[in-house]
């Protein structure tokens, strides 16, 4: 093989290795660092998420508003409310009207059950961000069998208040509602961007 060809192959190989190394570094740079408290924080946040679902499915409004900070915000298809009293008012009105959409064959309100699938949680000190896929099901299928109603994405901001994680903002996106869908991009990228902006003192820090 001519030496010129060997040199060209060597140059191409070296360029490929540098490219792969750069891609690897970029991928590593996108991964957040986890503190030694992360497992404990994540467990507490996952527990909070579960308590939210049990509260809404069993109409326990004291428990429901209790997962939000005093100045917390809830945003979903019915609108946006800030503060526990306003959140309670909005969500109870929503629950009272849900029978129009979910009901058994004899016309009674169906039993709704929410499920969280996977969650990505970013913790930075006493602030956290999360993205979770959720789905909703109810016994409003034929002969009152279970039927999946809708699904979507939770966009969460959390803060630690007196040693307890609480929602400072929960945004509920619904893939069945065009104006409330999550969009084509990876939601985790936006979550990490919000966390990085907070760390740098940008708009997300407010």
Model-assigned labels for residue ranges:
Residues 1-13:
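Bacterial N-terminal signal peptides that target proteins for export
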Residues 11-22:
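Bacterial N-terminal signal peptides
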Residues 27-67:
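Short, low-complexity N-terminal intrinsically disordered segments enriched in polar/charged residues
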Residues 30, 127-131, 151-187:
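Short beta-strand edge/turn micro-motifs at domain boundaries
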Residues 39-40, 118, 123-127, 184-206:
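Flexible low-complexity loop/turn motifs enriched in small/helix-breaking residues
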Residues 61-134:
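A solvent-exposed, acidic/Ser-Thr-rich amphipathic alpha-helical stretch
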Residues 114-116, 148-154:
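Short, surface-exposed coil-to-beta transition loops
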Residues 136-138:
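Beta-strand elements of well-folded, non-transmembrane domains
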